[in-house]
Structures are given as C-alpha cells and as structure tokens.
Amino acid sequence: MAAINRDDVAHLARLAHIEMSAEELDRMAVELAVIVDSVKSVSEAAGEDVPATSHPIPLTNVFREDVVGHTFTAEQALSGAPDSYENRFKVPAILDED
C-alpha cells in the first residue's frame, strides 16, 4: 500500500477546507492509499514502447461526407420571415446596448 497516513489526509483536508472526523480521516487514508496504488499499477502497465493514444482502437469518421445539396438563396430563405434587414433575419433585441 502507498504511504498515505492519517496526518497526510488531515493536511489535505485542511488545505481543502474540509472538516473531517477521526473516523473519516482513518477511512480516507485507507481509500486514498488504494487509489494511489491503483494509479501506480496503471502507470507501470504502459511501457515506454507503447505509444500514447486517445482511443484503444483506431477510429475513422463514420459519418457521411459533407455534400452540398439544394440551397436557398437569401431571398428564398427570408421569404417567410416576419422581418428582415440587409438580407438577414431581423429579430427583437434581447440584450441592452450600453
């Protein structure tokens, strides 16, 4: 087990402004030691000959290619709009201009 004791946990609790009882300090010392040991074993598992990866298997883009299809002209897009200005949709202001 990792060398994390009750005093280390109490110090971390003080730094984090967390109040912990004696029982909580003891239990947390054991739990943190297990976590540190687990992280240590994972870091030892990957050797220097293993390249860093973001995914365990190679991924390719599974989505379709972007293909330009039928598009509207500005006039067609704005034809059903209640109001427009300079080929843009005109909407009520939602923020004050200061």
Curated annotation (Swiss-Prot):
EC number: 6.3.5.-
Superkingdom of source: Bacteria
InterPro entries: Asp/Glu-ADT_sf_sub_c, GatC
Molecular function per GO: asparaginyl-tRNA synthase (glutamine-hydrolyzing) activity; ATP binding; glutaminyl-tRNA synthase (glutamine-hydrolyzing) activity
Pfam short name (any one): GatC
Signal sequence range: none
GO biological process, one term: translation
Catalyzed reactions per annotation: L-glutamyl-tRNA(Gln) + L-glutamine + ATP + H2O = L-glutaminyl-tRNA(Gln) + L-glutamate + ADP + phosphate + H(+); L-aspartyl-tRNA(Asn) + L-glutamine + ATP + H2O = L-asparaginyl-tRNA(Asn) + L-glutamate + ADP + phosphate + 2 H(+)
Function as written in the Swiss-Prot or TrEMBL entry: Allows the formation of correctly charged Asn-tRNA(Asn) or Gln-tRNA(Gln) through the transamidation of misacylated Asp-tRNA(Asn) or Glu-tRNA(Gln) in organisms which lack either or both of asparaginyl-tRNA or glutaminyl-tRNA synthetases. The reaction takes place in the presence of glutamine and ATP through an activated phospho-Asp-tRNA(Asn) or phospho-Glu-tRNA(Gln).
Family: Belongs to the GatC family.
Subunit comment: Heterotrimer of A, B and C subunits.
Protein name (record): Aspartyl/glutamyl-tRNA(Asn/Gln) amidotransferase subunit C
Native source organism of the sequence: Paenarthrobacter aurescens (strain TC1)
Lineage of source species: Bacteria, Bacillati, Actinomycetota, Actinomycetes, Micrococcales
